[in-house]
Amino acid sequence: RGLGDVYKRQVQLESFGPARQTDGAYTIKAYDASVIRQPACGQVDLSYFSDAAFLGDSLTVGFSDYQINLSGALICGYTGVGPDAIVNRAAVKSPTRGQEVALDVLAAAQPKKLYILLGTNTLTTLGASDRFLAYYGQMLDELRQTLGEDCIIYVQSIPPVRPAAAEKKPGLASDVLRGVNEQLAQLAASKGCVYLDLWEALADGEGNLKEMIAAPDGVHLSAGNGYGAWVTYL
């Protein structure tokens, strides 16, 4: 009898979630991001995004600026925005629609899928993550209430940056982002959302943004290779 059989016999796992129980001699710890993240589920064509919305900061703005084909998905990208602005219903500027309140735009559209990417513009300094994560949790609650249970909410990990960019913005250093993303994964699971690990597509072996897909500033993505890699991953 293999160790796996003994394990299965002695430990009974409950329903899927971010935490696990203690049973017998085994302590089942909380899942980490590598387990929580959504695995590949087969390729879909771009029409999959026709009933989707994308909510985020300047990285999401790039979908509009570079006219990335997402089959008419609603792009709610706002430069410099963080989850606090969404929760507090701040007036934010869309490059295509002007001033608006993101929650109102999403409430009117009622997308079936929502892809969130926030953090790159708000985690540039060390010590900002606690406030960021607290607001992120509140934001997910607000979005669920606004969009209902039928909307699939995808929480995307904060992408890595190039080493030179991390030196200027220590809050975006690889080890810092790994820690924040780990907490984002746990938060997503606890709120019934799907966690997507963009590092699978965007990070090199050292945990930095791949040079070939980086914009000159080392933080944003290049129009062709960068956004192509992102969309292909999604």
Locations of regions flagged by a protein language model:
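A short helix->loop->beta-strand "cap" motif at the edges of active sites that frequently abuts
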Residues: L147-I152
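Surface-exposed amphipathic alpha-helices with a cationic face
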Residues: L140-R144
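Charged helix-capping and loop-helix junction motifs
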Residues: S129-M139, L177-R178
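Short, small-residue-biased leader/transition segments that mark boundaries at the very start
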Residues: G2-Y7
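Non-catalytic propeptide/linker segments at domain boundaries
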Residues: K8-L46
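Conserved SGNH/GDSL esterase-like catalytic core that processes O-acyl groups on lipids
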Residues: G42-A134
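Alpha/beta-hydrolase-fold catalytic nucleophile elbow
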Residues: L117, Q156-S157
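Catalytic His-Asp segment of secreted/periplasmic serine-dependent ester chemistry enzymes
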Residues: V161-L234
